[in-house]
Amino acid sequence: MARSNFLFTSESVSEGHPDKVCDRISDAVVDLYLAADPFARVACETLTTTNKIVLAGEVRGPASITKEKVEETARNAVKAIGYEQEGFHWKNADVEVLLHAQSADIAQGVDAAGNKDEGAGDQGIMFGYACTETDVLMPSPIYYAHRILKRMAEDRHSGKRPEFEPDAKSQVTMKYENGKPVGVTSVVVSTQHKANVSQADLRELVRDAVKSVLPNGWFPPEEEFYVNPTGNFVIGGPDGDAGLTGRKIIVDTYGGWAPHGGGAFSGKDPTKVDRSAAYASRYLAKNVVAAGLSERCTIQLSYAIGVSKPLSIYCDLHGTGKVEEDAIEKAVAKCMDLSPRGIREHLQLNRPIYERTAAYGHFGRVPESDGGFSWEKTDLADKLKAEIR
């Protein structure tokens, strides 16, 4: 039996966290290639450390995209985050580009040829989740953890809070009663800051950001509000800790509330089902909930390399469904082509829309006019309802 009264915690990290710097650089490279060729192939991994950026991976795209353009793209991504520190500066960091051609063995399994449809770029399992806890149909703990850091970043970029530096983390513990979120029992925020800021002043600046995003009455007790528990946090970002692409997959998704298949998103073009099928799974789960068919929904898809159709479709409505799970499984298969090509075309993923996804979650975002966050639309809800009837 599912528990109804409990505490649950999720964390987020800011755009300036070392791993998120790498995610952003990798996704900026994906956008660089897709802007030049919507069918380019990209698998770009990034490492950052003190004044050093290394990009490695496999690509297939226009020859006009030179190492110099990739380097410029990496620097611009770091500049946009705001790193102009002695140990990590967008202008002075050494950038090494080690991208090379995609393996022909992999390409032959993915490419469409003759009457053979495009296959998945790899095997794997992908999960999507949605629930009615928030207006964007995301779990509350990760939703508020993201919003705290996003507000702090907005205040830093606008100049309202020049005391903040780019690197930060948050953690929110939510109290549930009868299965519903009713308040926050603790908040942890660790943020890099200017050297001349006292911890007392920093605490009040962070308090303002937290209060601005939590519902009235949800701010935790003072003794459960933690700001930089270890003290000063002046040295941060890649100068303080090395970063790698794909190290924050739980932050990127549901904050631990739902299963994860293990595949990271950033640095991958949409032929990679690690990314595209995870987006499709979220899209399907969100539309099931938006259709009023359930209060909670988990969708799993699985694939084999070189095979176009999913090997399995699984649905769990967590005891909140108005229909049976197998009805959902049959309906989603009829309402959406879940081949890699079908997903890309339905969600229009062959666009340069990925750099913006690299921080504050890939899910629970607002669909944008240029196709960004298309997997957050609820335009399949009516079709699903009609199919089940």
UniProtKB/Swiss-Prot annotation:
Cofactor(s) needed: Mg(2+); K(+)
Annotated binding of Mg(2+), by residue: 19
Signal peptide coordinates: none
InterPro entries on file: ADOMET_SYNTHASE_CS, S-AdoMet_synt_C, S-AdoMet_synt_central, S-AdoMet_synt_N, S-AdoMet_synthetase, S-AdoMet_synthetase_sfam
Annotated stretches, region: Flexible loop: 102-112
Superkingdom of this protein's organism: Bacteria
Cellular component terms per the entry's GO annotation: cytoplasm
NCBIfam families in the record: metK
Subunit details: Homotetramer; dimer of dimers.
Protein name as annotated: S-adenosylmethionine synthase
